[in-house]
Design a protein with these regions (language model features):
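Conserved beta-strand hairpin/beta-sheet module of binuclear metal-dependent hydrolase folds
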Residues: 8-12, 17-67, 154-171, 188
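Active-site environment of divalent metal-dependent phosphoester hydrolases
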Residues: 36, 84-86, 109-110, 151-152, ...
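Active-site neighborhood of phospho(di)ester-bond hydrolases with catalytic His/Asp-centered motifs
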Residues: 51-54, 74-82, 103-105, 167-170, ...
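Active-site metal-binding motif and surrounding structural segment of the metallo-beta-lactamase
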Residues: 57-104
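Metal-dependent catalytic neighborhoods of phosphoester/phosphodiester hydrolases
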Residues: 88-97, 113-114, 252-259
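Metallo-beta-lactamase
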Residues: 105-156, 160-163
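Cap/insert and terminal regions of metallo-dependent hydrolase folds
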Residues: 177-280
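Short, basic/aromatic-enriched C-terminal tail that caps enzymatic domains
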Residues: 276-292
Length: 292
């Protein structure tokens, strides 16, 4: 297990990097989001972290090329949980960049069961982490937190660097108060808005799968997200970017998710208005890089 950061993930002074003359503290590139594969890149000038590895080598490289990123190295791969859409490409990613893997012990055991032998052969160091733990990778401070999902030990993450904070929070059945606390004071919030309740009920999934999605260890509905966004005691509206992610192809669509979120944001008190940008992450193509 790695040592927790002694300052418990408080921001440490660093330097921002430049993009076209503009100073950037942290860049976020959501390369894919959805049930067919999840992949997010976080960068400072000196550190590069990949969150999840749900795409194969060829598609991962193609997505990076489409946003003009040619990575000669990675400093870490972090895995939120062992479901295929978050880890299927992990053996190839580890082989490509020979980077350390950061994962909880129960999730690591699950990965060893569900991934091929090439996964074990390509490991280049495993850093065991725990929910609630804070640690640093380069100049990025990371905080892992527990989320309610039907996996071995699912976690979300917050990242701090150069005064900016990013949160990655998908694959959870509901929004516990502690999760809401972790998401406060976030400048880029990547939040699941998986399904529309009515579309799910009449959709193609078998009833047992619908029950799983709707459970407290399933996925967040548009309605659950709207209730969170409308509540100033939950969502603090600090975010410069609010990204709706992990949108179901079968039981949702981007317009429905966006309208639900926009309506919720109009219900906020005047003194707590959201003035940031509402964005939709896609399964099929990267979102433009978000710079903080």
């Amino acid at each position: 297990m790695i040592d927790s950061h002694p300052a418990l993930c408080h921001y440490f002074a660093g330097f921002a990097f430049s993009s076209g003359g503009i100073s950037i503290g942290l860049r976020v590139s959501i390369l894919a989001s959805g049930s067919s594969g999840n992949l997010t890149l976080l960068e400072t000038e000196s550190t590069r972290i990949l969150v999840d590895a749900g795409l194969g080598k060829r598609e991962t490289l193609a997505r990076l090329a489409s946003i003009q990123r040619d990575l000669d190295r990675l400093d870490a791969v972090l895995i939120t949980h062992e479901h295929a859409d978050h880890c299927n490409g992990l053996p190839q990613v580890l082989g490509l960049w020979k980077t350390p893997l950061y994962v909880t012990e129960p999730t690591m055991a699950a990965l060893q069961r569900c991934l091929p032998e090439t996964f074990r052969k390509r490991l280049n160091g495993v850093e065991t982490i725990e929910p609630g733990q804070c640690f640093s990778i380069g100049d990025i401070d990371v905080h892992a937190f527990a989320i309610p999902h039907d996996a071995a030990d699912p976690i979300g993450f917050t990242f701090r660097a150069n005064g900016a904070k990013v949160a990655v929070c998908t694959d959870l059945g509901y929004m516990p108060q502690l999760v809401k606390v972790h998401l406060r004071e976030t400048h880029c919030l990547i939040l699941e808005s998986n399904h529309d309740l009515d579309m799910l009920k009449v959709g193609p999934y078998p009833w047992v799968v619908k029950q799983r999605v709707l459970s407290r260890t399933g996925h967040l509905s548009n309605h659950a997200v709207s209730e969170y966004l409308a509540d100033p005691d939950g969502f603090d509206a600090v975010a410069r970017y609010l990204v709706l992610a992990h949108i179901s192809r079968e039981n949702n669509n981007p317009d429905v998710a966006r309208i639900s979120a926009e309506e919720a944001l109009t219900r906020r008190p005047v003194e707590s208005t959201f003035s940031g940008e509402l964005l939709i992450a896609s399964q099929d193509s990267p979102l433009r890089p978000l710079e903080l």
